[in-house]
A protein has these predicted regions:
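Intrinsically disordered, low-complexity serine/threonine- and proline-rich regulatory segments
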Residues: 1-22, 101-105, 111
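Short, hydrophobic-biased segments on the C-terminal half of alpha helices
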Residues: 57, 61-65
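DNA-recognition alpha helix
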Residues: 39-51
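Hydrophobic residues on short alpha-helical segments
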Residues: 24-29
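Beta-hairpin "wing" of winged helix-turn-helix
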Residues: 68-84
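Amphipathic alpha-helical dimerization/coiled-coil segments
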Residues: 96-121
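Basic, amphipathic "hinge/linker" alpha-helix immediately C-terminal to the N-terminal HTH DNA-binding motif
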Residues: 81, 85-102
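Short capping segments at the starts of secondary-structure elements
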Residues: 30-40
Length: 121
């Protein structure tokens, strides 16, 4: 039982570190096909990750501001029926190219048959 507890604790720590590094990936994936407001990005991340990833709206706003400053994300403002205009974020051409290269270098490697075989043994 002690061994299982240790594995669970180590796994939780590993996943927390892993999740922190994945937020950018999930935000870019959310914006890959269409413009989204922060609430839609949050919902996309939680739904597509099957609940594995969750993020606070404040974290998303902070990251989106950083990405905007770097020129990889921009936004259009749209009027909504109530309240202030809503910002709909999208990847710029540089952001799209950056995301594509990241996927090619870091994600598609996991689709290689040799890697799949190791993961599923």
């Amino acid at each position: 039982m002690e061994k299982d507890l240790m594995i669970t604790e180590l796994l939780n720590a590993w996943e927390e570190t892993y999740k922190k590094g994945q937020l950018t990936f999930w935000v870019f994936l959310a914006l890959k096909e269409e413009n989204k407001c922060v609430e839609e990005i949050k919902e996309f991340v939680e739904t597509m990750s099957e609940g594995f990833m969750s993020c606070e709206e404040q974290s998303l706003y902070r990251n989106l501001r950083k990405f905007q400053h770097l020129g990889i994300v921009a936004y259009d403002s749209k009027r909504v029926s109530k309240g202030p205009d809503r910002k709909y974020y999208y990847l710029t051409d540089i952001g799209k190219a950056l995301f594509q290269r990241f996927v090619e270098r870091n994600i598609l490697i996991f689709t290689k048959e040799s890697i799949i075989n190791l993961l599923t043994k």
